[in-house]
Structure formats: C-alpha cells, structure tokens
Amino acid sequence: MGDRIYILVMVLNKEEYLDDILDKLAELGVTGGTIIDSTGMAEQLFCNERIPIVGGLRQIFEQCRTSNKTLFSIIENKETLNKAQKVVQGEICDFNDPGIGISFSVPVENVIGIPTDNLNQLKS
C-alpha cells in the first residue's frame, strides 16, 4: 500500500445532500465512514443563553439548535480522495456557496482498529 491514507471530512450544513454524497462515495468504492450530528461554533455561541442578544433577537428564530451532519471517511489513496472530492464538488453541491458546508482532507499517519485487508476493500 505505498500511498498514504487520508481522512475525508465533510461538514454539511445542508443535510439534504448527505444521501447523494454517500451514494457517490460508495460508487467510488468508499464504503466506510462515520456520520455524526454536529453544531457549528457560531450557531452554538448565538444560541448560548449566557450571551445577551439585543432586543430578544434570539426569539425570532424558532429553532435555535440546528444540526449539521459531519462525515468522516478513511480513504486509502490520494487518487480516490481526489475523485471523491471532485465528484461531490462537481456533481452534488458546491462547497464554495455560502451555507453549504466545508470539505477537507488530512493525511493519516497511523490507523489502528481497521485491518489492512479492510483498507484494501475501500478501493474495490
């Protein structure tokens, strides 16, 4: 496995894109990942009861706690990573549009808990 392993992280403010993203990743052979509910820091600070907001502005918003979906997926090589990000960015959503979310990847030095055989299956 001469290539590096990466973790792909996508924070989706628009949850409606999640299923399409998962379908596209699966088509590329990326079948493992973890999805968690998350909240952005700005949202959390705005909803914090201890921070005063002028004129009860907080009450304008019926649902203060909106959640994002954050996807973490280990990807075995740079080629698959680039394809995954390109397909999602080009066919499903544009992370450059305000309010969509963010996507980034980080090289991973050590992976413990996933046997090498399972990492190889990520490509197939």
Language-model regions, residue ranges each:
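Positively charged, small/polar-rich N-terminal and surface patches that mediate targeting and assembly
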Residues: 1-124
